[in-house]
Structure formats: structure tokens, C-alpha cells
Amino acid sequence: VSSLSGSGSGSVDERLPVIAVTGMAFEARIARGPGVEAVFAARSDLLERALSEALARGCSGIISFGTAGGLAPELEPGTLVIASSVSGPFGIIDTDPEWSARLFAAFAGTPLEARAVRGTMAGVAAPLTGVQEKSSMYRATGALAVDMESHIAGAIATARGLPFAMCRAIVDPAWRSLPSAATAGLRDDGTTTILPILRELLKEPSQLGALLRVAGDARAARTSLVQARHALGVAGALGV
């Protein structure tokens, strides 16, 4: 799924937007705006298709934007990660250092300054929902956080010779496992529905407490993403 909004500024072509790659519809709604087109899907083939369609219209760069699972144990929900690279199924893919530096600098003097970190990310094909899974990934990679879209965005950006950057907000911290109800409502296309979540809770009502904690984590991540998008827009940091 994709949507185009506004015209961007960039060294490649001032009329071309940056493409924000996300996994979920709400992330895309936050990301899109003047100069930024957003594509989203939870299933990798759908995401690749949406990104390919957006690329056919032209772009000046690709940014992976949205939420992530925490791997580094010291990082709280709502922490923003501006990544230097993503390691995953396609190996290690570096981000554009100058663009990444401008993204990070945009948070100076804002409430986000204390919540933003730089480091590496991990990319996976299936969600890491358990504490042990996250711990193993952290030991293996040293990555601060993990998501399912950044390695795809990075591989395509590299193949096309486009600048690539990443801005991700942590939802579930390293020490928190996700109950099955937390992911039950996510459709392949990146939209959500409530009925599967309710069915999971009916099957296992004891998940409710954990689900409410996840909801609190999600609010923190969403707040950080909204604030980040505003700060990046004000600073002009989304233009390549």
C-alpha cells in the first residue's frame, strides 16, 4: 500500500520525494507529508511490491521509519534509534553517514535529544517476541533493536544506488515478551483489526495484563515517532 503526498527536496532531483518504508499503516500515516511518500505492508513480498511501485515514480532516497523491538537491555520504550547499519538476511547494509548524522542532529534541543541513540539494527523475516530470542540476537549481533522492514529497504536502496537511512522507535523493550494477542490483529497488508485480538484474549484471558503493558509501550513509541517526524521536518533533515 502506498500514498504520495507533496514534493520533496533532494540532491538527486528536487521534485522527487524520499520514500519512508514502514510495516504498519499507522507508521506510514506519521511518516508521510510534504516531500515524503510512505509505503507499508507487514508481509515482505507486499512491502517489496509497494516499494517497487513507489520507486517507479522516482525518489531521492529511502528511509526506514517506524517501530522496532528492543534488543539492548538498557533501552526503554520510546527510545529512537538512528542506525548506522542493519544486519540481516542480506548481510550488513550501511546507512548513508551524512544523512544519518543530519537526522540525529535534528533532535538537538528537543525532548528527543535524551531519547535518541545511534548504533546498529538487526533485520529479521519473522518477529522476535520472546525475551530469550531477543537476548540471543543481541549477543549474536550487538544490535540495539530489530525490525522486519529495514533490511528490505536497505537492500533495495543499495541495489538502486539510493541514499538509505533508518529512524526507529522501540516498542517492546528487550526484557518484555509479547503475548500472542499483541500481534494477532496485524494483517499482511499492514492494517490492523480487533477481532483476532479479542479471540486470543477469550482463549487465554491471562494475556490481558501483558497486552495492556504492550499498549503502554506502543503509546511511548508512537509519541516518539510523531515528535521525531515533526523535528525532522522542521530541520529539513528528511531531504537527501
Give residue spans per PLM region.
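Glycine-rich phosphate- or other oxyanion-binding loops that anchor nucleotides, phosphorylated ligands
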Residues: 13-240
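Intrinsically disordered, low-complexity terminal tails and inter-domain linkers enriched
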Residues: 3-14
